Amino acid sequence: VSAKHLLPEIKPAPPHGHWVRFLPHEEPVLVQKGHWIGFDLDGTLSRTDNPGHFEPPYPIGEPFAEMLAVVSALKEAGVQVKIFTARACEPSNVPLVKAWARKHGLGELEVTHQKDYDLLRFYDDRAIQVSWPGTMITAPVKSQRL
């Protein structure tokens, strides 16, 4: 499966940061130094169909190569990336998530469960984007089965 349509187009904008076109149909966005892009872990960076995923010790699934390519492209350009996951609510899970990221070639990434005003964009398999002013709502890319 080709992930070329997912790869961001990135151009340096020294000394401020980088211009990033996240998707081909979007306008470029200035990602300033200090701003960060968040990626959910379960269902976004990693699969959730592995045996025992929803049972203790909650093993992290295999990666989605396409999403790892997006993270890698942003990191290589100097854009700050963090893994944003509910797993980080338990401090003992943070080293496990970091080890998973290293194992799959992402290097050192901050792992958090807290948003702040520097979060510029968030990739999540369950999110619905609401944009104001107006009433534009963007549905999630994939649906969840009951």
Annotate each language-model stretch with its function.
Residues 2-146:
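HAD-like aspartate-dependent phosphatase fold
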